[in-house]
Each structure stands twice: as C-alpha cells, then as structure tokens.
Amino acid sequence: MSDSEVKDVPVAPVEEVEAPVEAPVEAALEPSVEAPVEAPVESTVEAGEPAPERTRKHIESDDDDEEVQAPVEEQVTIDSSEDPKSQRQILEDRLDRLLKKTSGRRQRADEHDLEQYLDEKILRLKDEMNIAAQMDIETLNKRIEEGENKSQDKKPLVAIQKVKLLPKVMSILSKANLADTILDNNLLQSVRIWLEPLPDGSLPSFEIQKSLFAALDDLPIKTEHLKESGLGRVVIFYTKSKRVEPQLARLAEKLIAEWTRPIIGASDNYRDKRIMQLEFDSEKLKRKSALDSAKRKKNKVSKPSSSASKGSSAQTLYEQAAARRNRAAAPAQTTTDYKYAPVSNITSVPTNARTVGVGSSLNNNELYKKLSSRLAKPGKRS
C-alpha cells in the first residue's frame, strides 16, 4: 500500500465519526426545543432516507405544547395583573369565614355538652342528698323504736350521712358559675329536706344550718324557685323557732325580707321608702311639759309614799344606789324607735343668700361693704 492509500483509509471513518459528534454538541448548546428537531433531520438527510412523518410528528408535538401552554400563560397573566395584597386579603377572608363557621359549630356543640354535663352533675348530687337525708331519718327512727330497751353492748346509732356529704355539697353551692344550673335543676328542694326538723323534733347540726344558710344568701333565688322547692316555709320556721341560734335567725329574717320584697312590690332603695312625717309644734310641747310637771308635783304632795315606791321601781339598781349615796348616776343607754319624722323647713331659707362660714347668710353687697370697710382702715393695711 502506498502512503496516499494509507492516509485515505483513516480519513473516511474520522469524518463519519465527527458528524454524529458535532450534532449532539450543537444540540446541547442550543435550546431544548430546537435540538431534537434539527439533529434527526440532518441525520436523515445525510443518510438519504425520507423523514416527512418524523418531522411532522415533532412539529405537531410543538403545536400541541404551544396550545397547552397558551391558557396557562393567560391564566398566569390574569392572576399577575391583580394586586398580590388583594389576593392575599381574599384568601384570608375565605379562611376566616371557614374557621368562623367551624369554630361556631364546635363552640355550640361544646356548650351543649358542658350544659348537659353540669345538669347531670347537679342531678346526681340531688339524688345523693336525698339518699343521705333518708338514711339519717331511718337511723333516727330505729333509735326511737329501740328506746331504752337497747343493750349496752350495741353501739349508739348516729345519723352522720348528711355531715359526711356536706363538704361535697358546699363545694357545688359555693361556685358562682353553677348558680343558674343549681336553680334550674331544683337543688333547693334537697336543701329544704336537709334543713327540715328531724323525726325526733331536733334540728339538723349547727354546721349544716350555718353552711346552707350562707349558701342561700349568695344564690339569686326568685319567686318561682321558692314555689317549686317549698324552701320559704322552712326558712320562716327558722325565724320563729326559739331553738335557732340568734345569728341564724337574723340571717333567715334577712332572706325572707329579700324574697318577699318583689312579691309585695317594695323597693330596696332608701329613697323609695315611705316615711311618715309630722309637723313639730314647739308651743304645744311646752304646754304639755308644763302640765306633766304640775301633775307630778300634785302627785308628790298627795301620795308621797306611793310616788316614792313607783319612782324606785322605775329606777335601776345602779340609780337607786346612787340616790341612797346622794350622788349622780350616769345615764343608761336606751334604744328609741321613732315612728314619725319631722317636716323639713329648709325651703323657707332664701336662695339668694351666700353662706360664708357656719351660720352666716351675707349676700354679695354686704360682704363687699364689709371687706371695703376693713381695707379702708389705715392700721389694717400694714
């Protein structure tokens, strides 16, 4: 082989290798859409094979891609034309409306469940109170039936079921948020049963009385609650019984006054209170006091012994001892209840008077004259 033939042999494959190498390099540098279209066309043209269907296929795919991308671009341009703040506000408003609807439903459901739970709790406590009261009554009845025939070996029967349950009852009655639930479920009926006298005529323990009356004072009890529970009759009994402690009797009277005020239409405001008034006549009082003193003198002259005995009986032991020693006695404290109030005469005072100090009624002219006369004196200026 000659040198020219040797040179020609490797050249042909080099050209064939370079052609497919250049195409992918150009395809990699060019855009992704044009690269797959141009590379196959060059290869088919070089090979001499017809490729109309292949080129059409790529063209059709490009058209489809443009058609698909067109509405997306339009949608993006429509959204971008709006203010992003307004879009964010619209989304936030929608979310708020959805959250409010769900939260309102949940809140109503939670409130309903809570009310149902509280009602069941109060009703269970009511049953426990009634059972405890019934057990104490049965215990007292057994003790009455046994009487003196019981043996010394047996332990005495003590009714302590209500005392055991009292802390739980007070923990419920002392909660202000349960006041409406307590009144609606008629728990006052069980309170009435606890405050009623026992079969042997005795009253409940002092701790039960004091705790329940304090709880009743805090509850907003109305007339319909009293009618439904019958509590008013028991409280009236506590106001009239002599076995009740004075402080509890006063508290019972206070409760009765508060409960009966709306029934009789009375107001708790002092300004609305009706006060009977009576005009005071000083001359009439003087005449009456003179007549009384004359009668006393006449009685002393006619019946000295009887008057002395009456005077001694009217006096206290301290006053009698002071009279025997010829000494003065300190006046004793007395409680006076007035029925009539004096008629006010403040309206008779002239309205144009200006008070300067206590008891003075100098008008502006007199005050000015007095000040000017003081300033006119030479000794007062210094």
Swiss-Prot record:
Location(s) in or outside the cell: Nucleus
Q: Where is the composition biased (Polar residues)?
A: 344-360
The answer on whether this UniProt entry bears the keyword Heme reads: no
Which residue intervals are annotated with compositional bias (Low complexity) in the record? 9-47, 302-314
Q: Where is this region: Disordered?
A: 1-87, 289-360
Which keywords accompany this UniProt record?
Nucleus, Transcription, Transcription regulation
Q: Name one GO molecular function term.
A: chromatin binding
The highest taxon in the source lineage is: Eukaryota
**Gene Ontology biological process terms in this record:** nucleosome assembly; poly(A)+ mRNA export from nucleus; regulation of transcription by RNA polymerase II; regulation of transcription elongation by RNA polymerase II
Biased composition (Basic and acidic residues) is annotated at 51-60
GO-annotated cellular components: RNA polymerase II, core complex
Q: Which InterPro entries match?
A: RNAPII_TF_IWS1, TFIIS/LEDGF_dom_sf, TFIIS_N
- Keyword Transcription, does the record have it? yes
Family of this protein: Belongs to the IWS1 family.
Protein's UniProt name: Transcription factor IWS1
Record the organism.
Candida glabrata (strain ATCC 2001 / BCRC 20586 / JCM 3761 / NBRC 0622 / NRRL Y-65 / CBS 138)
Underlying gene: IWS1
